[in-house]
Amino acid sequence: MSVKTQTITVLPGDHVGTEIVNEPTKVLKAIEAPTPYQKIQFDFKHHLIGGAAIDATGVPLPDDALESAKSSDAVLLGAVGGPKWGTGTVRPEQGLLKIRKELNLYANIRPCNFASDSLLELSPLKAEVVKGTNLIIVRELVGGIYFGERQEQEESEDHQTAWYRPKYTVDEVTRITRMAAFMALQHNPPLPIWSLDKANVLASSRLWRKTVDKVISEEFPALSVQHQLIDSAAMILIQNPTKLSGIIITSNMFGDIISDEASVIPGSLGLLPSASLASLPDTNTAFGLYEPCHGSAPDLPANKVNPIATILSAASMLRLALDCVKETEALEEAVKQVLDSGIRTADLRGTSSTTEVGDAIAETVTKILKQNT
């Protein structure tokens, strides 16, 4: 059996980020054992990012971390930020924005579903409202207002003005539309596509809508796309989330907001993974950065954070970047079994610690893989 070595750059980041990256690396080490599919080895390279990097080097993304990421098969990130670093000139979040831009991670993929039906009762919405919710948000990640021209208050002549310009090009919208279409076509039948914008107000949204229509009609005629204003979609997501089941495609800022809104539907931010991709995963080898949806949670006690979002991010990495589809399925099943067994952290009304949940998932995925040998 041949050995495939995958190099993973690990960027713990700040606060709980330093804890949660230990659990997926533990689980991936468990998967290293021979399986009926292939022999895998992981080579983990740890580097600083965010506030920890600022404290150590003065910058939120040191050159060695960026170079390691560029030379790796994938990047696993914890979380960045915290009140210690405030909103000063040098901020932890700048490291995240820079690595996205430098690695051309133009598409952020965030699912919103229930890892197990046993979690339905934990949703802040009624179980009968959220049951069956299964949507994937495809967010454009390196364009729009976050990367547009800007003027800070202190840069204006009267010190009373600050602005950003939300800008999109046809090429930027075209490639994110193709990503959404690819994701839709991975299902049989293909999933519907919802495009969220503010075309009744913003010129950039009108270009967005026109381009999405053109790409879908000319390149993917078998797919359907419906347009929804972002404010209306935000209401629908709470009133009737299953209506938006399918693929949601939207711009950088709108995606930032709507994906966070969607992330609370399953009951905890600690459940949902995220992948930021630099290319279509059409050969299951798309380079990307994988991270949980939640932030650095600086107020959370040690060993109390839910590691499942980060572990499922590693599962996405196995599927999309490393061509380990069977291992991904085994890991997702292991997460479901552990949740159903009642081994849960406090955010899921459990009493288990971060490491206990990680240990249980590592042990369970090992058993599942051995059963298939």
UniProtKB/Swiss-Prot annotation:
Record Gene3D superfamilies: Isopropylmalate Dehydrogenase
Record's GO cellular component terms: cytosol
Binding site for substrate: R100, R110, R139, D231
Entry cofactors: Mg(2+); Mn(2+)
Positions contributing to Mg(2+) binding: D231, D256, D260
EC id: 1.1.1.85
List of residues binding NAD(+): 82-93, 295-306
Note describing how the cofactor binds: Binds 1 Mg(2+) or Mn(2+) ion per subunit.
Catalytic activity: (2R,3S)-3-isopropylmalate + NAD(+) = 4-methyl-2-oxopentanoate + CO2 + NADH
SMART domains given in the database record: Iso_dh
UniProt pathway annotation: Amino-acid biosynthesis; L-leucine biosynthesis; L-leucine from 3-methyl-2-oxobutanoate: step 3/4
Compartment annotation: Cytoplasm
Site entry (Important for catalysis), positions: Y146, K198
InterPro entries the record matches: IsoCit/isopropylmalate_DH_CS, IsoPropMal-DH-like_dom, Isopropylmalate_DH
Transmembrane segments: none
Keywords: Amino-acid biosynthesis, Branched-chain amino acid biosynthesis, Cytoplasm, Leucine biosynthesis, Magnesium, Manganese, Metal-binding, NAD, Oxidoreductase
Top-level EC class as recorded in UniProt: oxidoreductase
Principal subcellular localisation of the protein: cytoplasm
UniProt GO BP: L-leucine biosynthetic process
Record-level Gene Ontology MF annotations: 3-isopropylmalate dehydrogenase activity; magnesium ion binding; NAD binding
Family: Belongs to the isocitrate and isopropylmalate dehydrogenases family.
Subunit structure: Homodimer.
Function text: Catalyzes the oxidation of 3-carboxy-2-hydroxy-4-methylpentanoate (3-isopropylmalate) to 3-carboxy-4-methyl-2-oxopentanoate. The product decarboxylates to 4-methyl-2 oxopentanoate.
NCBIfam families named among the record's database cross-references: leuB (TIGR00169)
Protein name in UniProt: 3-isopropylmalate dehydrogenase
Organism: Candida albicans (Yeast)
